[in-house]
C-alpha cells in the first residue's frame, strides 16, 4: 500500500504531531480510554502503533517438521486522529502545538497547559 501512495502524483507527506515514544490516550474505537506508548509512526498513512492497544491475533503455521504452530498477538496500527497526547504529570489529554523558543529552537507544547514536551 505504501508503494501505491508514493506513486500518486499529488502525494504529500502528512505532518504528524505525535512522535515515537509519546504517551497517548485512545479517544475513539474499541480501546477508548486506554493509554499506551507509541511504538511506531507511519506518516505516509497517518497511522500509529501503540503498545498494548488494538491487539490482533495471528495464527502461524509450522515452517519445519517437528515444529508446532502458534498463536501470536501483535499490535495493529490506529489512525492518528483516534489518539491524543496524554500528560502523565497533569493527568489530561491535550492537542500539541509547535513554537519557537527564545534560542530559536522549534519545540512542542500542550495547548491546554502550555507544558513543554521536548
Swiss-Prot record:
PROSITE patterns: RIBOSOMAL_L24. Signal peptide: none annotated. GO terms for molecular function: rRNA binding; structural constituent of ribosome. CDD domains: KOW_RPL26. GO terms for cellular component: ribonucleoprotein complex; ribosome. GO terms for biological process: translation. SMART domains: KOW (SM00739). Keywords: Ribonucleoprotein, Ribosomal protein, RNA-binding, rRNA-binding. InterPro entries: KOW, Rib_uL2_dom2, Ribosomal_uL24, Ribosomal_uL24_CS, Ribosomal_uL24_KOW, Translation_prot_SH3-like_sf. Part of the 50S ribosomal subunit. Belongs to the universal ribosomal protein uL24 family. PANTHER family: MITOCHONDRIAL RIBOSOMAL PROTEIN L24. One of two assembly initiator proteins, it binds directly to the 5'-end of the 23S rRNA, where it nucleates assembly of the 50S subunit. One of the proteins that surrounds the polypeptide exit tunnel on the outside of the subunit. HAMAP family: Ribosomal_uL24_B (MF_01326_B). This is Large ribosomal subunit protein uL24. It comes from Prochlorococcus marinus (strain AS9601).
Amino acid at each position: 500500500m505504501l508503494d501505491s501512495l508514493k506513486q500518486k502524483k499529488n502525494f504529500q507527506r502528512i505532518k504528524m504531531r505525535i512522535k515515537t515514544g509519546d504517551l497517548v490516550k485512545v479517544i475513539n474505537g474499541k480501546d477508548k480510554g486506554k493509554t499506551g506508548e507509541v511504538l511506531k509512526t507511519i506518516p505516509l498513512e497517518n497511522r500509529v502503533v501503540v503498545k498494548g492497544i488494538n491487539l490482533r491475533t495471528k495464527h502461524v503455521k509450522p515452517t519445519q517438521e517437528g515444529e508446532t504452530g502458534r498463536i501470536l498477538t501483535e499490535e495493529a496500527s490506529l489512525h492518528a486522529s483516534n489518539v491524543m497526547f496524554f500528560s502523565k504529570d497533569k493527568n489530561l489529554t491535550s492537542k500539541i502545538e509547535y513554537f519557537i523558543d527564545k534560542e530559536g529552537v522549534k519545540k512542542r507544547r500542550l495547548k491546554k497547559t502550555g507544558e513543554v514536551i521536548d
